[in-house]
Amino acid sequence: LLGVHLEGPCLSSEYKGAMPEHLLMHTADAELFAKYQKASGGHVRYTTLAPEIPGVPGLIPRLNAMGIVCAMGHSGAGYDQCAACVDAGVRSVTHLGNAMRLFHQHDPAIFGVALERDVYVEAICDGRHLHPGTVRLYLKAKGYDRVVAVTDSIMAAGLPDGSYKLGVNDVIVENGDAKLPNGVRAGSTLTMAQALRNLMAFTGE
């Protein structure tokens, strides 16, 4: 086990995606993260935080000290909030372009900071979450050494269509597309091997 990505619980309610609302935290709590790290045997290596959650900028150095790399995502934060989190130690952006406020010319928000600053950006390479041209844009803006192909997959990865679980949520997979009963996309069924094949197809490499 290389490590666990703890995607939450300090995430925006507005941009939570398929995350259950009642499990989100609306104030950063370093002690809770310390408990998670202890319970995992020290295997939490990466976490996603929304910069607008009160206390998150101050939490970042404390998590880094626990050996946890901090990313930002599932967020509606503005440019200044996101830039402050990068200054505090954020090193990556979780599935850029999905479950977040998008670029606007008057406030580039998390998307603008992701492309401007020296951070890694994740791209879900299933052809559903991002248009292939968007993935090429990331590569052109960031370079191959700063773009990370990810799956965002759930337990249905590589399995037939049907009914599955995502934590406490029921998920329906049709034509390989995973969604909650209300139609909200719930991760993917992508395997890492297929993500890399897709990335090569998107880029012509």
Identify the meaning behind each predicted range:
Residues 1-43:
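Divalent-metal coordination cores built from histidine and acidic residues
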Residues 11, 20, 76, 155, ...:
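Short, flexible micro-motifs
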Residues 25, 94-99, 169-174:
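A polyampholytic, Gly/Pro-enriched intrinsically disordered region
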Residues 25-28, 126-130, 184-191:
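Catalytic cores of large soluble enzymes that bind and process phosphate-bearing ligands
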Residues 31-159:
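Active-site core of metal-dependent hydrolases
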Residues 109-123, 140-151, 156-205:
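His/Asp/Glu-enriched, well-ordered alpha-helical/loop segment
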